[in-house]
Amino acid sequence: MFASLLVVALIGAIAWAGSAVGLSYLFGVVLPYVAVVTFFLGVIWRMVYWAKSPVPFSIPTTGGQEKSLDFIKQEKWDCPNTKFGVVVRMFLEVCFFRSLFRNTAADVREFDPVNKGPRTIYYSSKWLWFFALLFHYCFLLVFIRHFRFFMDPVPGWLTFMESIDGIMQIGSPRFYWTGGLLLVAVLFLLARRLFNQRLRYISLMNDYFPLLLILGIVLSGICMRYFDKTDIAQV
């Protein structure tokens, strides 16, 4: 974790130093375009690499009861046998993280009255699903909401979305719920890796780095809007 934190701090320090010596155009215009191009090229390369990789046999990732005898109930969305069922399953997975919704956790009960001793128990755990969903959708809305700085005139649907996001009219400038909820979601995902011993044991630098980087982006955005009150339109 500390290595990831050091890298994120180093990135912030380089950006601050570049701005201090008059390289604002490089860090504010050139590098963002380079980053976007690099991102799309990397995604395309990865997709081509995966497409060329040999797949000797099919590895299903379904769950639940497959289609069998008529009197055995099939899990149609978890283990579909039709194209429509596959489309529904993919939609639920991509848009609602259905596999995380089925997440379970294991624990050891020190004394179980039935076994008269320790017993391993399994229970449903929806926290990861909830905060993962909250994180991704808030991040998406924040990303879309920033399009208003690049459009003139601003589309009506974007203005409407912005008004809904700040519907409570708290503070000046008004508080956007997606920014606050995104911060809460990132802190939960980071705390989950820090305080869960088993998860912390298997976590690598590239597990912490995205969370810390996004946390830095969120905190800097909140600071610019509510504390420093930076005029982004002028920038």
Where are the regions a protein language model picked out?
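Membrane-interface amphipathic/juxtamembrane segments adjacent to transmembrane helices
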Residues: 31-99, 108
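Long, contiguous internal "core" modules enriched in hydrophobic/ aromatic residues
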Residues: 100, 105-235
